[in-house]
Regions:
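Active-site and donor-binding regions of nucleotide-sugar-utilizing enzymes
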Residues: 1-146, 160-173, 182, 186-187
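Charged active-site motifs of nucleotide-sugar-dependent glycosyltransferases
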Residues: 151-159, 190-191
């Protein structure tokens, strides 16, 4: 089996032959997207050309719907099996996307069990696979420690959620930390969770 694509260090360590560096897609916000749009469109075309050249048996895309679902739609005419992992949050907004992607995807892998119904209703073969964090070896231990701390009625708890993309974390985390320090000066009974 040969695996070509766009991925990070973990996928590269498993033998992925990269088309380009995934860091180019790690962007946040409309302004950053607009600045990098010409590069993103070039990478989209490059990826499609590579798929045409390689003639794969299957194309599997992971998350990044702005890039990957456009790619999947653009290669529909190639008659290659298409699977996407991490459904767009159609249950939260833009529910029409479920119908849209059912026209070009062959199968969808979803993180949450309630997501299935939105896509099955549109005729898209869908499988619930679970969230990867649930398979983390340290997950149970971390949950236990968090639950133990959350049960402390004297503490106020605040979650700091800077995002998952490096760009988001770099921009938001310093602001979150500054806010946490300011709050901690006045309120000693606060515990922050990241």
């Amino acid at each position: 089996i040969e695996i070509f694509g766009v991925g990070g260090s973990k996928m590269l360590s498993q033998g992925l032959k990269p088309i380009f560096n995934i860091k180019f897609l790690s962007i946040m916000g409309i302004f950053e997207v607009l600045l990098k749009l010409p590069k993103i469109l070039k990478l989209l075309k490059l990826t499609k050309r590579k798929i045409i050249e390689i003639k794969p048996d299957i194309v599997i895309t992971i998350d990044a719907p702005g890039f990957n679902l456009r790619l999947q739609k653009s290669i529909k005419s190639l008659n290659v099996k298409q699977i996407h992992y991490v459904a767009p949050s159609v249950w939260a907004w833009k529910s029409y996307r479920a119908k849209k992607i059912s026209k070009f995807l062959d199968h969808l892998l979803v993180l949450f069990p309630f997501e299935k119904k939105f896509f099955i209703k549109e005729g898209l073969s869908t499988t619930f696979v679970g969230h990867p964090i649930a398979f983390d070896d340290n997950f149970d231990k971390n949950i236990y420690n968090v639950e133990k701390s959350l049960n402390d009625k004297l503490l106020k708890k605040i979650a700091l959620l800077p995002g998952s993309r490096l760009g988001e974390i770099k921009k938001l985390m310093p602001v979150f930390i500054k806010a946490a320090h300011l709050l901690n000066k006045d309120y000693k009974s606060i515990k922050f969770y990241i």
